[in-house]
């Protein structure tokens, strides 16, 4: 062996010795500490492979709070839903989401914003997603869903068409959402302009979907060389599609878009970075609705009793409406708010499939009080992680048969919404958390709920829809998606649909 090789081996051994000597020890008052068997990496491989299974094992071993080593970072995991409010409402000087958000923004979307303040941005965006602006968004979304769904069905004729359910749901909702937020070809609309809208928004979806499929690897920095080249190409295409100059001529742009672009200009953001910011916002506002609709429709198609209950509710609404749903140019908020069965189906779908990580950076050494009066010390520089998918959403103490879809789980016997769920004999405030919580709860929650419900109503009132094979099983999750919002399936589910005559 050459001297160079020996010196290299010695350097590696010294580095390993250094890493081993720096292995952290648990201090009094801290959560249980699990370092794993590999220096520095710790549990990174297990966590990345299947976060839910890994964290379930850790909970069984250590209880509802513990610290694990993951790729050089110490992550304290809290799985007691009674104690979540302590975290999500804490001061940013103690527990802050912003550093992690900025890290993902730069790593996934190549986006750098000067003096970026997520709290200020949310405050600017909030009015454009609520109240009167929410009504305008909801009405525009209904119009654009009709353009995407009914225009395509007219062009395709009245016969059966086959497609993957995820592709169908995702493409329909993202295309309509893009037109709603970023504008349409012309106003007033014509048959020609609507056809152009369908083609253009479909192009946006196809390109976006390529980026979406790479998102977990982008976030973890694990793309191959070939994938990196492909990611760069896809991002460049999206930046061109969503450039401020390209969007300037579009009609009926949302107040959200106008406000957000003004905000970016006031910050002195270049047009190139503005385009990247708009790609980020396309993912943030539209990336979860399509997968949600996929799971919801699949659960309905696999559960005839649930589908019958939703159909019965829609018939009641049609009977009570001032004019037929088929003739409505918009679904009034009053109608959208009077669908308790569909609301329960949506909540149950989200309970089973929404799996975001709620993360905070620990900004100072602090004591974290638990709901049961215990208190644990957290160290500055660590990361705190909540995973509501495990608890409360999949907790057998809170939900009987938590792995089973029950369409009426969130309904009381009198048909009203059920909100009373318990753990350890105490009523839970946070019993289902697909939208996050506290300072970082999703601003677009109402817009997303309205959009998904409108999509389901249009689909069930205008189309016949069925599985290609009745024996189709509910697919397994793509395990790499844990932490990024709605889970996606490992494979799509073939369906057939046709316009109802």
UniProtKB/Swiss-Prot annotation:
Question: From the UniProt record, which GO molecular function terms apply?
Answer: heme binding; hydroperoxy icosatetraenoate dehydratase activity; iron ion binding; monooxygenase activity; oxidoreductase activity, acting on paired donors, with incorporation or reduction of molecular oxygen; prostaglandin-I synthase activity
* Binding annotation for heme: 442
- Catalysed reactions, as listed in the record: prostaglandin H2 = prostaglandin I2; a hydroperoxyeicosatetraenoate = an oxoeicosatetraenoate + H2O; (15S)-hydroperoxy-(5Z,8Z,11Z,13E)-eicosatetraenoate = 15-oxo-(5Z,8Z,11Z,13E)-eicosatetraenoate + H2O; (15S)-hydroperoxy-(5Z,8Z,11Z,13E)-eicosatetraenoate + AH2 = (15S)-hydroxy-(5Z,8Z,11Z,13E)-eicosatetraenoate + A + H2O
Q: Keywords in UniProt for this one?
A: Endoplasmic reticulum, Fatty acid biosynthesis, Fatty acid metabolism, Heme, Iron, Isomerase, Lipid biosynthesis, Lipid metabolism, Lyase, Membrane, Metal-binding, Prostaglandin biosynthesis, Prostaglandin metabolism, Transmembrane, Transmembrane helix
Sequence positions that bind substrate? 107, 113, 288, 359-360, 383
* EC number in record: 5.3.99.4, 4.2.1.152
Q: Which cofactor does it need?
A: heme
Q: How does it sit in the membrane?
A: Single-pass membrane protein
Transmembrane domains' residue ranges: 1-21
Cross-referenced SUPFAM superfamilies: Cytochrome P450
> Which Gene Ontology cellular component annotation is one that this UniProt entry carries?
endoplasmic reticulum
Cellular location(s): Endoplasmic reticulum membrane
One Gene Ontology term of the biological-process aspect is: positive regulation of angiogenesis
Pfam families referenced in this protein's UniProt entry, alphabetically = p450
Main localisation: endoplasmic reticulum
Its function, per the record, reads: Catalyzes the biosynthesis and metabolism of eicosanoids. Catalyzes the isomerization of prostaglandin H2 to prostacyclin (= prostaglandin I2), a potent mediator of vasodilation and inhibitor of platelet aggregation. Additionally, displays dehydratase activity, toward hydroperoxyeicosatetraenoates (HPETEs), especially toward (15S)-hydroperoxy-(5Z,8Z,11Z,13E)-eicosatetraenoate (15(S)-HPETE).
Q: Family per UniProt?
A: Belongs to the cytochrome P450 family.
PANTHER family given in the database record: PROSTACYCLIN SYNTHASE, PTHR24306
What this protein is called in its record is Prostacyclin synthase
**Which organism encodes this protein?**
Rattus norvegicus
Taxonomic lineage of this organism? Eukaryota, Metazoa, Chordata, Craniata, Vertebrata
The gene behind this protein is Ptgis
